[in-house]
């Protein structure tokens, strides 16, 4: 494995910020081979130049986190963690134990101290940070298998960038966010539903080589000391030759909400399908995970950020609801391994590693964006400026207005339903 990690004196695994910033290294748990070859395009991402926010975003992630000795991002900002936990305990006292017994958090009014100064719509674009590298390469190849490899690498490459400790603001119905990517692609996000919260997006390559569309139906619930987040919904990358690769996202676990190490992990499976070329790709996150009881008596064999996967012919392999229970070994075309915090290998060739610097997105001039843009929200603007009390005030005003609009909408629906029933009765 190439040198992508260094060990701290406490035994934790620390991520370097550049290819040369690590003086000591360890080999990944997935392989002991020190002669791993990388695909050529990776060399484009070992230095940063351009207008994108990728380096700033990644530097923030590296400042806040280090890789836990058992895998996963461990949050290391003790001051921020102490502040957040104080707010969380206050929340439990004010709303009762329902908050730690599985109550849906997306419909819960949370204190502003738990938020970062941006909307979830902007956070969605963090997953697109490596788009100019991988999606361009995917669009330019004529090999369907290589294209599937690039799309899978694109998704894996962005996972470590999504694990910020602070919560983004819930978007308002009709809220938008727009930005550009380094290759000239443009992204547009919109909140299309409030209950349930649904965020949609469209990423368009400037010459029509690819189009990435989809939406997240997002939910989160707390169980004791753990929050589980789910991002359901379709993701489709359509290429100029008519190929469409559809895929799903894994769930996320945030452990240590109230006590212990604050660690973020991904769990479950991702399934990519290319029906035109009879191809599929399955990625399993934390494949050797132990159950709750077993974890008390046994030590897990591999880090929890481990990924195991394969690309295979769909043929007669049954795919249902985003899952493929059993894959015929004869249909497997290549194997994948690695972790979402070190490197990602496909048939022992490196397709991504943590030393790579993402392009990120380029923000547009606020004067050119729509009036509904996230950046125009008063609560977000004041939080960015550090005006906590003003941010609280505007957040409360926005939430009161949302409740009022919902009440008016519900009353109108009831009234319309009543009129329909009366019309039917009169017709008889």
Swiss-Prot record:
Tell me yes or no: is Repressor among this UniProt entry's keywords. no
Q: Where is this region: Disordered?
A: 1-32, 396-428
User: Cross-referenced InterPro entries, in alphabetical order?
Assistant: OSBP_sf, Oxysterol-bd
What's in the keyword line of the UniProt record?
Coiled coil
**Looking at the UniProt record for this protein, which Gene Ontology cellular component terms does it annotate, in alphabetical order?**
cytosol; membrane
Coiled-coil intervals, chain numbering? 389-422
* Sequence ranges of Low complexity compositional bias: 18-32
Q: Where is the composition biased (Polar residues)?
A: 1-11
Q: Name one GO molecular function term.
A: sterol binding
Q: Which family does it belong to?
A: Belongs to the OSBP family.
Identification of the protein by name: Oxysterol-binding protein 9
From which organism does this entry originate?
A: Dictyostelium discoideum (Social amoeba)
Name the gene behind this protein.
osbI
